[in-house]
Every structure is written in structure tokens, then in C-alpha cells.
UniProtKB/Swiss-Prot annotation:
The gene is CLV1A. The lineage of its organism: Eukaryota, Viridiplantae, Streptophyta, Embryophyta, Tracheophyta. Belongs to the protein kinase superfamily. Ser/Thr protein kinase family. It is found in: Cell membrane. This is Leucine-rich repeat receptor-like kinase protein CLV1a. Its EC number is 2.7.11.1. It comes from Glycine max. GO terms for biological process: cell differentiation. InterPro entries: Kinase-like_dom_sf, Leu-rich_rpt, Leu-rich_rpt_typical-subtyp, LRR_dom_sf, LRR_N_plant-typ, Prot_kinase_dom, Ser-Thr/Tyr_kinase_cat_dom, Ser/Thr_kinase_AS. Expressed in roots, leaves, vegetative shoot apex, and reproductive floral apex.
């Protein structure tokens, strides 16, 4: 009897368990399906989470993609990264109370986190990084998650103070809060974490002093507090007590003062990044006690003194970046003996003397850059002993002697820059056969001899040998350089004819062979090289006529054959070359009359001077003008009649099309609002603001309205022209995919969009002070004082820097200009208008475009020539904006003869008898400015000229620009530098 009762009881318990398990299983499935419905959003692809479907099977949900269950069929893990999803996290997430791992990163989820997350008390791993979550981070919902070990909220839109509730999570090991908008100081309580091993707070808007109490985090191994924060004071000396720390990143966060010698006590530290701050003083020799150190970056500071000799103890060092400081003295010989050193970058310092000849003997060197110092002597021969050296950069020094054969035969090299030295002798032939090299720059040296007859290299894009003593003929083997874009052989002693094979290169855009002893005609192949953008053959002894077919060169912008012996007539087909802005045919033997009309209207008489038998329309006698006037008038009448007839037909067609589109529009006027954050407004409110009296701007892509919402807020509404989707969406997709996802205080925030089948309306935060262009060139012109101009430059640079260096993939704006830098109520700058933006997946790579985009006067030369765009194209455009801030004039239209602002500045420098930086600035500075610090203007001017260098790779990065602008010389604020006009 007793056994029967026991059996019955067990059976009852089993059925109860089965019922509970069944209910829990179906409950988890229901929760997952509700998650799918909410998180997909309207913009997700149809196949997103396609296998998340209802089933009567108890275990079906355990086989959903990204879902894992325990033995009781309860969901314990969800990983739906990279789907992508565009909705929000619903309250039903709290029903998955057995969840241990929730990873929803790399999506486009928006809104605030639901309070129901607090029910996930078993959660150990929470990753919501790379989304668009906004608002204050709800620290209270984390408190019940007592098992939490990993919390990653990187790259979202969270604002407010750093939550202090995290400190109570005793098992938390990994806390990643960077890439948000957290502000205020780092809480002192953050020193109370019990188990924390990883803490990253970089790329926020933090301020105040770095708490010295963080040194109490004895379990911490990685600490990142840097980029885009703006702390006060310096590095806490107490950090030296963090003996477990292996990685410390305090880069680019406004730190000042000296480097504390006490940091040397961090014996386990392998990475120390202090670059891009305002650190001063000498490099503490005590740092040599950090025997585990592998990467040391002190670049972009104001450090002085010499490299400590005790650094010879750093046997594990692989990276030594000391560039852009005020270091002096010689490079100690022990640097060449560091057994693991791979990267040595010392550029822009005051180092002198000879380099140690043992550099590279460790067989590890990859990157070597000592540009802009005062080094002399011979080039070390063993730099490429490793066979892995990629960059050899020694420009702007005093090196002499030859280029060692060992370097010339280094097949791993990608960049060779040795211009502006005193190098001499023949260039080893091997340097012209390196398979991976992309740049060879040897200009302004004393090299001699002939170029080798055999030249090859599939990667070489820039070959610059200008201003040397090269002789002999230009080798036809240059045709083997199939990737060559820039060929500069000017100011040498080359002779013979120009080999026609040169112009068979498919990517050639810039050719400068001026200032040699070349003879013979211009090769007929010249007019077949349709990629050409700039050609300078001046100051030679060329003869013959200009080959026929010039009009085929549709990208040619500069053509200079002055001071030669070229004859024949000026090609009439030049009139059709709309890209040609600079033409110089002066001092030749041209005959006849200069053609008129078309592109010839752009050129002045200077372009044709010094040709005795050539006359212009002003100097040639009028011939039978009256005889032609009658027939021409009749012809004109016929043309006018035809135009009127065609116009009438066009109006009828347009009217019919208009009525058809109007009928279609009525069917498509269902507006829908999509917000990238919580918006307290409705689509109808936005549409009601599309009135003539609300227009605040017009452009090629659409009209911008000011919208006053019922809640009292103002928004900017950009109504895009054209259809709502498709290939010609006038930047709608580009804006959504770029500014819709990114967040930075100096990038105009896209709040959301309103759309129907015919029209897209983009909603932005309203900028009451308009654009920088309006303040410089409009009715408000001249009211910006220098301090405000400088502030705007720094802030706009930070916005672009974020696009280039903190977005993944990086974003190229492609239309940087003063009209796209908007100013809020406090005159803080915001980069705007991403309708032309493009993603670029590798920094330093380029992307080919089908046509030129951007604004005339701001477009980088290589972009206009090759249609290839990279982040350095934006740098050029920003340099033009800096010149606008200094000069106060538009980039084009004010300098005559197709000259832009960059060309005008260079021309002004050449015209000055003593062209110092100060003289140039005083000659070009905005006359409306008064009381400005001259040194500050000169400083920005020099940065601007770095940005607008003709060759893209020689321009600084936006990160370097930000650092330079943020760290002006102290003397720029001294009152004795003020200029009153």
C-alpha cells in the first residue's frame, strides 16, 4: 500500500514538473517571438531572424538562430549581432529570466532600455554595443544582476553622468562604456570595484580630474580613459601602484604637466599610450624600470630633453613613438640594439647628429620615420635586415651620401621618402624594381647619373625625382609602372625626346617634366592618355605642333608648355575642354590667331604671351565682320523659332506629367515618422511646417525648413528632391546610414525622418546661428572675431576626426565646406550634410567614384583627377575651410582666371620679395579682422597649408590636425602679438 502511495506521489510530481516545463518552454518561445517583432523594426530585411517562427514543438525555440537553451529547454543565451535590427528592446525581454548571455551588438536598435531587464538576475554577459540606444543609462536595472561579469555598452547615445550602481556588482570583470556621451567627472566610487579587470571610458565627454583613487583597483589589467575626453590636471602619480595593470591608454584627453616617474613601478605594463596631450618636461629615465613594456607612444606632446640612456633596459620594446615633440640630442646607439624594436618614429623633433649605424641590426624593423629633424651623416645600411621594412621616411634632414643598396633592394618597402636632403651619387637601380613600393620621393637632393633602362613595379603610384642632377634619356620602361599616377622629373638634365610610352600609362594623372633639356615633338600618345589632369612640359626645347585630339583629355586641368619651340596654330578644340583652368603656351613659336569663345574665355593674354606671330582677338584686325552679320542673324532667328517650338512642346509634356504625378502623389501621402531617439512629435506636425515662410535654406539636394513643434522645440526639416528611394535618392540613404548611426557633439544629430512613397523629410537638431559660410561670406560677414574662428576650426576638426578615426568602417564626408559647418546657439560647430558620404573600410585605402562629387573650390586634386577618394580628400577640403577662416573670402570666384583660394595664396607668396609666413599672412588675412594674435593666425595658416598639399599622402590625418589645433604655441595668446588694423 505504501509503495502504491509513493508511486502515485512521484507520478503527480512528474506531471507537475512536466506542466511547468511545458509552460516555461512555450513562455520563452512567446517572449522570443515578441522580441523579434519589436527588434526587427520597419527597416530590417525580410530574412532577419527568419527562422524565429512559432511551433508546437517544445524545443523549437532552442533551434532559433542565435539562441541556446539548457536541459530544461529554457533560453540561456541570445546572440543576434550583425543582423541588422532597427527596432527596440521590448518589455518581454524580462520573461527570459534564465538568460545568462544577451548579445545584441552591431545593430541599429534605438530607444531606452526597458526596466524589465532587471528581471534577468542570472545574466552574466550583457553586450548592447554598436547600437543607437539613448537617454540616461538606467543603472538601477543592473543592480539585481548580481552574477554579471561583462557589461559592454560601447558606441551608443547614452548621456548623463556615469552610473555609480555598477560598483555594487561584485563579480563584474569587464566594463566598457566608451563611445557614448557620458559627461561630468569620473566618480570616486569607481575605485571600489571588487573584481574589475577591464575599464574603458574613452571617447565620451568626461571632464574634471582623473581620480587618483582609481589606483585602488588592484585587479585591473586594462585601463582606457582617453580620446575625446577633456580632463583637468595631469596623470595621477598614484597610478604607479597599480601593479596588475598591463595596458594604460590616456591618449588625447587634455592632460598637462609632467610624466610621473612613479609610473615606473607598473612592472607588468606592456602598453603605455600618452600621445596627443599637453605633457611637458623630460621623459623620466625611471620608465626604464617598466621591463615588460612593449609599446610606448609619447607623440604629439611638448616633451623636451633627450632619449634616456637607461631605456636600453627596455628589451621587450617593439614600438617607440616620440614624434612631434621638442626632443633633441642624438639617437643613442642602444636603440639599434633593442632586440624586438619594430617601429621607430621620431619625426618632427630637434634630433641632430648621425643616426646609429646599427639601426635595424636586430632584424625586426618595419616602420622607420625620422622626417623633419636635423640628422646628418650616412643612412644606416641595415634598416631592412629584417626583410620586413615597410616605410623608410627621412625627408627634411641633412643626410648625405648614397642610398644604400640594401635599402634599394628591400622588397618589403611600401614607401620611400627621402626628399630635401643632400643625398648624392647614382640611385641604385633596384629601387625602381621594388614590387610593393607605392611612393618614391627623392626630390631636392644631388643625385646624378642616368635612370636604369629596366624599370618595373606594379604598385608604384608616385615617382618624384625633381630638382636633382639626373642626366640621359627618360627610359621608355616607365610604361611598366601600370599604377603610376604622378611622375615628377622636373628640374634635372634629362635630354632626348619624351618617350611616347609614358602616356600609355592607364592611371597617369600628373606629369611634370619641366626644366630639362628635352627636344623633339610632344608624343602623339599624349592625347590618348585620358586620365591626365595636370601636365607641365615647360622650360625645355620641344618643337613641332601640339598633337590633335586635345579635347579627348576631359579631365585635364593644367597644361603648361611655355618656354619651348612649339609651333603651329593654337588648337581650336581647346574651346571644348571645360576642365582646363590653367593654360600656358607663352614663349613659343605659335602662329595665327588665338581662338575665341568656349573655354578660351577663361584664359588671359598672359597664356599666349611671347609668341611673335600669334595674335589675340584684341590685336588681330577685324575681318569681314559685317559680311557675316546678315546670315548670322537669319540663323539666329531660325534657332530662336526652333527653341520656342521645343519649349512649347516641353511645357505641354511637363504639364501632363505634372498632373499625372499629382494624382500619384495623393495616393502616396501617408506619412510615417521614424525616430533615432525618443521624439515627442508627430509626422503631421512636421509636414505642417513645409511652408514658404519657414524656408531657411535651399541646395541642390533639397530645401531646408525651420519647424516649430507643438512641444516648443525647433527642428530643421530637410525636404529632399526627387523620389523617396532608388538610385537617385539625393543622399537619403547616405544620411541615414552615416549620420543616422554616428554620435559626436560636433556632428549635427539626425533625429529621425518622415517619409512616404514620394518624399523624404530628414529631421535634424535646429542650428539657430546658421552656417559658417553665412558668417564669413553673407550679410553677417566680418562679425566673427579671431577667437571664435579658431574655436570653430577646432570643433569642426574634431567632428571630421571622429568620422575618420572612430567610426567603423570609417566615413568620408566628400563635401566638407563652410556652408556644411553649422553653428548652434552657443556657436559650437557641427559638421552637417552627409548626402555624399561614403564608407571606407580601410584607413589609407581609396575608393573609386563614378563621377566627381563635392563643391568646386574644395575638391582635392587627386579626386578631381582620378575619381579616387580617401580620407585625405576630406583633409584637403578642411584645409580650404581653414583658409576661408583666415582670409574671409570664398574659395573660388574672387581671384580671377580660374584661380582658387589655394592657388591665390601660393601666387601671393611667390610675388612677395621676402615670403615669410608672417608676410604671407599679413598679405592675405581678412581685412575685417582686428586685434588678432599674429602668431595664432600664422599657426593655423601653416596647418591649412599642410592640409592642402597637392599629394594626398603628404597631408596630415584629421587626428593630427585636431591635435595641432588644440595645442597651439603658448605665445599665440601673448598680447604683444596682437595686430590692430
Amino acid at each position: 500500500m505504501r509503495s502504491c502511495v509513493c508511486y502515485t506521489l512521484l507520478l503527480f510530481v512528474f506531471f507537475i514538473w512536466l506542466h511547468v516545463a511545458t509552460c516555461s518552454s512555450f513562455s520563452d518561445m512567446d517572449a522570443l517571438l515578441k522580441l523579434k517583432e519589436s527588434m526587427k523594426g520597419d527597416r530590417a530585411k525580410d530574412d532577419a531572424l527568419h527562422d524565429w517562427k512559432f511551433s508546437t514543438s517544445l524545443s523549437a525555440h532552442c533551434f532559433f538562430s542565435g539562441v541556446s537553451c539548457d536541459q530544461e529547454l529554457r533560453v540561456v543565451a541570445i546572440n543576434v549581432s550583425f543582423v541588422p535590427l532597427f527596432g527596440h528592446v521590448p518589455p518581454e525581454i524580462g520573461e527570459l529570466d534564465k538568460l545568462e548571455n544577451l548579445t545584441i551588438s552591431q545593430n541599429n536598435l534605438t530607444g531606452e532600455l526597458p526596466k524589465e531587464l532587471a528581471a534577468l538576475t542570472s545574466l552574466k554577459h550583457l553586450n548592447i554595443s554598436h547600437n543607437v540606444f539613448s537617454g540616461y543609462f538606467p543603472g538601477k536595472i543592473i543592480l539585481p544582476m548580481t552574477e554579471l561579469e561583462v557589461l559592454d555598452v560601447y558606441d551608443n547615445n547614452f548621456t548623463g553622468s556615469l552610473p555609480e550602481e555598477f560598483v555594487k556588482l561584485e563579480k563584474l570583470k569587464y566594463l566598457k562604456l566608451d563611445g557614448n556621451y557620458f559627461s561630468g567627472s569620473i566618480p570616486e566610487s569607481y575605485s571600489e570595484f571588487k573584481s574589475l579587470e577591464f575599464l574603458s571610458l574613452s571617447t565620451n565627454s568626461l571632464s574634471g580630474n582623473i581620480p587618483k583613487s582609481l589606483s585602488k583597483l588592484k585587479t585591473l589589467r586594462i585601463l582606457k580613459l582617453g580620446y575625446n575626453n577633456a580632463y583637468e590636471g595631469g596623470i595621477p602619480p598614484e597610478f604607479g601602484t597599480m601593479e596588475s595593470l598591463k595596458y594604460l591608454d590616456l591618449s588625447s584627453c587634455n592632460l598637462s604637466g609632467e610624466i610621473p616617474p612613479s609610473l615606473a613601478n607598473m612592472r607588468n605594463l606592456d602598453t603605455l599610450f600618452l600621445q596627443m596631450n599637453n605633457l611637458t618636461g623630460t621623459i623620466p629615465s625611471e620608465l626604464s624600470d617598466m621591463v615588460s613594456l612593449m609599446s610606448l607612444d609619447l607623440s604629439f606632446n611638448g616633451l623636451t630633453g633627450e632619449i634616456p640612456t637607461r631605456f636600453s633596459q627596455l628589451k621587450n620594446l617593439t614600438l617607440m613613438n616620440f614624434f612631434h615633440n621638442n626632443l633633441r640630442g642624438s639617437v643613442p646607439s642602444f636603440v639599434g640594439e633593442l632586440p624586438n624594436l619594430e617601429t621607430l618614429q621620431l619625426w618632427e623633433n630637434n634630433f641632430s647628429s648621425e643616426l646609429p649605424q646599427n639601426l635595424g641590426q636586430n632584424g625586426k624593423f618595419k616602420f622607420f620615420d625620422v622626417t623633419k629633424n636635423h640628422f646628418s651623416g650616412l643612412i644606416p645600411r641595415d634598416l631592412c635586415k629584417s626583410g620586413r621594412l615597410q616605410t623608410f621616411l627621412i625627408t627634411d634632414n641633412f643626410f648625405h651620401g648614397p642610398i644604400p643598396n640594401e635599402i634599394a633592394n628591400c622588397k618589403s618597402l611600401t614607401k620611400i621618402r627621402a626628399s630635401n636632403n643632400y643625398l648624392n651619387g647614382a640611385v641604385p637601380s633596384g629601387i625602381f624594381k621594388l614590387p610593393s613600393v607605392t611612393i618614391i620621393e627623392l626630390a631636392n637632393n644631388r643625385f646624378n647619373g642616368e635612370l636604369p633602362p629596366e624599370i618595373s613595379g606594379d604598385s608604384l603610384g608616385i615617382l618624384t625625382l625633381s630638382n636633382n642632377l639626373f642626366t640621359g634619356k627618360i627610359p621608355p620602361a616607365l610604361k611598366n609602372l601600370r599604377a603610376l599616377q604622378t611622375l615628377s622629373l622636373d628640374t634635372n638634365e634629362f635630354l632626348g625626346e619624351i618617350p611616347g610610352e609614358v602616356f600609355d600609362l592607364p592611371m597617369l594623372t600628373v606629369v611634370n617634366i619641366s626644366g630639362n633639356n628635352l627636344t623633339g615633338p610632344i608624343p602623339t600618345t599624349f592625347t590618348r592618355c585620358v586620365s591626365l589632369a595636370a601636365v607641365d612640359l615647360s622650360r625645355n626645347m620641344l618643337d613641332g605642333e601640339i598633337p590633335k585630339g586635345m579635347k579627348n583629355l576631359t579631365d585635364l586641368s593644367i597644361f603648361n608648355v611655355s618656354i619651348n619651340q612649339i609651333s603651329g596654330s593654337v588648337p581650336d578644340e581647346i574651346r571644348f575642354m571645360l576642365s582646363l583652368t590653367t593654360l600656358d603656351l607663352s614663349y613659343n613659336n605659335f602662329i595665327g590667331k588665338v581662338p575665341t569663345g568656349g573655354q578660351f574665355l577663361v584664359f588671359s593674354d598672359k597664356s599666349f604671351a611671347g609668341n611673335p606671330n600669334l595674335c589675340s582677338s584684341h590685336s588681330c584686325p577685324n575681318s569681314s565682320l559685317k559680311k557675316r552679320r546678315g546670315p548670322w542673324s537669319l540663323k539666329s532667328t531660325r534657332v530662336i523659332v526652333m527653341v520656342i517650338a521645343l519649349a512649347t512642346a516641353a511645357i505641354l509634356v511637363a504639364g501632363t506629367e505634372y498632373m499625372r504625378r499629382r494624382r500619384k502623389l495623393k495616393l502616396a501621402m501617408t506619412w510615417k515618422l521614424t525616430g533615432f531617439q525618443r521624439l515627442n512629435l508627430k509626422a503631421e506636425e512636421v509636414v505642417e511646417c513645409l511652408k514658404e515662410e519657414n524656408i531657411i535654406g535651399k541646395g541642390g539636394a533639397g530645401i531646408v525648413y525651420r519647424g516649430s513643434m507643438r512641444n516648443g522645440s525647433d527642428v530643421a526639416i530637410k525636404r529632399l528632391v526627387g523620389a523617396g528611394s532608388g538610385r537617385n535618392d539625393y543622399g537619403f540613404k547616405a544620411e541615414i546610414e552615416t549620420v543616422g548611426k554616428i554620435r559626436h557633439r560636433n556632428i549635427m544629430r539626425l533625429l529621425g525622418y518622415v517619409s512616404n512613397k514620394e518624399t523624404n523629410l530628414l529631421l535634424y537638431e535646429y542650428m539657430p546661428n546658421g552656417s559658417l559660410g553665412e558668417w564669413l561670406h553673407g550679410a553677417k560677414g566680418g562679425h566673427l572675431k579671431w577667437e571664435m574662428r579658431y574655436k570653430i576650426a577646432v570643433e569642426a576638426a574634431k567632428g571630421l576626426c571622429y568620422l575618420h578615426h572612430d567610426c567603423s568602417p570609417l566615413i568620408i564626408h566628400r563635401d566638407v565646406k563652410s556652408n556644411n559647418i553649422l553653428l548652434d546657439a552657443h556657436f559650437e560647430a557641427h559638421v552637417a550634410d552627409f548626402g555624399l558620404a561614403k564608407f571606407l573600410y580601410d584607413l589609407g585605402s581609396s575608393q573609386s567614384m563614378s563621377s566627381i562629387a563635392g563643391s568646386y573650390g574644395y575638391i582635392a586634386p587627386e579626386y578631381a583627377y582620378t575619381l579616387k577618394v580617401d580620407e585625405k580628400s576630406d583633409v584637403y577640403s578642411f584645409g580650404v575651410v581653414l583658409l576661408e577662416l583666415i582670409i574671409g573670402r570664398k574659395p573660388v570666384g574672387e581671384f580671377g582666371d580660374g584661380v582658387d583660394i589655394v592657388g591665390w595664396v601660393n601666387k601671393t607668396r611667390l610675388e612677395l620679395s621676402q615670403p615669410s609666413d608672417a608676410a604671407v599672412v599679413l598679405a592675405v588675412v581678412d581685412p575685417r579682422l582686428s586685434g588678432y594674435p599674429l602668431i595664432s593666425v600664422i599657426y593655423m595658416f601653416n596647418i591649412a597649408m599642410m592640409c592642402v598639399k597637392e599629394v594626398g599622402p603628404t597631408r596630415p590625418t584629421m587626428r593630427e590636425v585636431v591635435h595641432m589645433l588644440s595645442n597651439p604655441p603658448h605665445s599665440t595668446t601673448h598680447t604683444h602679438n596682437l595686430i590692430n588694423l
